[in-house]
Design a protein with these regions (language model features):
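Transmembrane alpha-helical segments and their cytosolic interface motifs
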Residues: 177-205
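Short, hydrophobic transmembrane alpha-helix segments
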Residues: 17-27, 46-50
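Membrane-spanning helices that line or support transport/gating and their immediate boundary helices
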Residues: 25-28, 72, 76, 129-140
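Central hydrophobic cores of alpha-helical transmembrane segments in multi-pass inner-membrane proteins
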Residues: 33-44
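Structural signature of hydrophobic alpha-helical transmembrane segments
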Residues: 4, 27-35
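Residue-level signature of catalytic and energy-coupling elements of molecular machines
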Residues: 29, 67, 134, 187
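Interfacial loop/helix-cap signal at membrane boundaries in integral membrane proteins
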Residues: 7-10, 14, 18, 38, ...
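Conserved small/polar residues in nucleotide/adenosyl-binding loops
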Residues: 211-215
Length: 215
């Protein structure tokens, strides 16, 4: 059952890309995505060591892919709404999308566009680019420090300060740390691509609302 979970999840995401979702199911998936992201954020902040949350890169990839698929699904519903009725856009897109959009934009398209421009600067230029650079530097420094750490373990073992079991544990920890930061480097690049795609999708939604708003 566990071996079939990942293929089933990937297949479900592909189905969402092709088949239009009912607004109720989309609302449930959006709420679940927000809840999972919040739990991941809290868990990541409360950890003292990176290896205490070693599954974070894989979870980050999964939730990023889920968010991208939900963005595409919500955009399909928005673009498929009746253009002659602007109210239908929010109704078809679901309560979560319309409610969050109305809360952030305050019911004004101009305010929504300004908020969108600010989010572009903050998310892409500051957060995403900075996180990508931090992941690259950390992964590089971790890999460069591996030989020195291995030599230190061998020196402690030769001096009798630690036994073979402790040396094996430390070597495994160094390898796991290098794997973690390497995976984070790849995941950060995936997140950056998702940020670009999300900004483009949001821009398309704004243009759609421009043409569907009453003159």
């Amino acid at each position: 059952t566990g071996d079939l979970l990942l293929p089933a999840a990937v297949l479900g995401l592909l189905v969402v890309l092709v088949v239009p979702l009912p607004s109720t199911i989309l609302d449930l998936l959006l709420v679940a995505n927000i809840a999972i992201a919040s739990l991941m954020l809290i868990n990541a902040i409360t950890q003292h060591k990176a290896l205490e949350f070693s599954s974070f890169p894989a979870l980050l990839l999964g939730t990023t892919l889920l968010r991208l698929v939900l963005n595409i699904a919500s955009t399909r519903l928005i673009l498929g709404a009746d253009a002659s009725s602007p109210a239908a856009v929010g109704e078809v897109a679901g309560a979560v999308s319309s409610g969050f959009g109305g809360f952030v934009a305050g019911g004004s398209l101009i305010v929504g566009f300004i908020i969108f421009a600010i989010l572009v600067i903050v998310q892409f230029v500051v957060i995403t680019k900075g996180a990508t650079r931090m992941s690259e530097v950390t992964a590089r420094f971790t890999l460069d420090a591996m030989p020195g750490k291995q030599m230190a373990i061998d020196a402690d073992l030769s001096a009798g300060l630690i036994d073979e079991q402790e040396a094996t544990r430390r070597r495994g920890e160094i390898t796991a740390e290098a794997d973690f930061y390497g995976a984070m480097d790849g995941a950060s690049k995936f997140v950056r691509g998702d940020a670009v795609a999300g900004l483009i999708i949001t821009g398309i939604n704004l243009v759609c609302l421009l043409y569907t708003s009453p003159s």
